[in-house]
UniProtKB/Swiss-Prot annotation:
GO biological process: dTMP biosynthetic process; dTTP biosynthetic process; methylation
Location(s) in or outside the cell: Cytoplasm
Protein name, per record: Thymidylate synthase
GO molecular function: thymidylate synthase activity
Annotated source species: Rhodopseudomonas palustris (strain BisB18)
EC number: 2.1.1.45
Amino acid sequence: MNQYHDLLQRILGEGAEKHDRTGTGTLSVFGHQMRFALDAGFPMLTTKRLPLKAIVHELLWFLKGDTNIKYLKDHGVSIWDEWADENGDLGPVYGSQWRSWPAADGRSIDQIADVVEMIKRNPDSRRLIVTAWNPAEIDQMALPPCHCLFQFYVARGRLSCQLYQRSADVFLGVPFNIASYALLTMMVAQVTGLKPGEFIHTLGDAHLYSNHLEQARLQLTRTPRDLPVMTINPQVTDIFGFRFEDFTLHNYDPHPHIKAEVAV
């Protein structure tokens, strides 16, 4: 995944020092794009170990429309703990917007169900979009959506996905986001009878926190290894029917984990 290493090098070489909401400080660049061909291997970073369990369970949690961390905690995933209230609630974050966007007329819009149906019915549509950025509810969210809009595209029997991420924690968050949306693209492709195409990751404010700079430099000393292969249970034909057991990652041989603190 040289695309990711190129981004690290760009930020370390060109990044502007900026203040941020957390008070940590960042090096930041604005506007960056990475492309991953999903038939070339599953884009799971190999220059440090990533937690597949957390990536898959978070995605399944989003698709459930859930916004309470109980499901995650029950499966040993703690990545949202810092933002939850005393009841485990996060407000109307990703899952709520994906599955039950509140319309002005009182309806609840299931964007995921709608986009899957539209891909099947009208694959050439330029409206194959899901957004989590709901200005009317931002203030109610524990954390406004960082990966805020994605669009599908069908050509030559393949499904591609482009994600726009307004705010990108490049050391901790971005590797996670790449794997998550690559997997989502594969899942949607399967249930719509298509093959996976590309995952395209477009970043707005792409930043390294000041307490992640040494870790990023360490990671750049490591040589990327061959990408693993993700297989999905072919019997699942409903986007909401996937379980953790339906995913198997083969030949994942990463370098060791690199510890870094989350900026809250």
